[in-house]
Amino acid sequence: GSRNFSKWCAQNGIPLQNNQVDIGVRVELPSIVWEDFSKKIYEPKIWYRSKGYGDKTRMFCFNERGSVVTENTDGVLTVNGHSYRDQSRKTENSNFALLSTIRFTEPFKQPIDYARHVASLANLISGGSVLVQRLGDLENGRRTDAKRLANSTTQPTLNAVPGDLSLCMPKRQLDNIIETLHALDAVAPGTANYDTLLYGIECKYYSARPQTENFMISGCKNIYAIGDGAGFTRSLSQAAANGLYVADQICSEN
């Protein structure tokens, strides 16, 4: 939706704002590591600002005793995570997203294409799949292979290809992720364990948004921009509420 909306705006001469993207990994570790938090908080969320670059890295989308999964978006495979209500489908691991936010400056204006390119590199290196790597192997500058993964104390819930994330993820984002993992280790010891698994690539897009007044596009009477695709919300519930709000607004005016 966001790409179609951006294309429509370009065709109609409507300027857009927002030039950032989140790129990172899906972290998987034994559920006991974050159990103290997950038993009290439905979804722990933490933001961390790196000392090296001053970038924001965020932990979110926490799945207690869940599974890592793949997503296919227009032929590009990325990773995600979920957990099942059915107790029989629970796992021994928990997973969460750990993404670094990068805001681009002029003249670059294609952050979504940038993220898709990074993800496609992981697809290329893995032979059409996604990658998984132990944190310890990543920090020691070596690839995780099938033998090392089999010996890992954390066993993967997704059949990803063991590999080297440093071959596809930009250094800046990778540095931010490693630094954040060690900061999280101070909160939940064991987070930065050698056998903590990192799956890549995971991306979250920030849709470009137009200038609006009460969600009506500036210079375009009776044309409204709302929801995730227009860059105003970041979830299904927010987008639905945004639609209801604007609908009430239109009805009150008429």
How would you label these PLM feature ranges?
Residues 1-254:
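Residues forming the flavin
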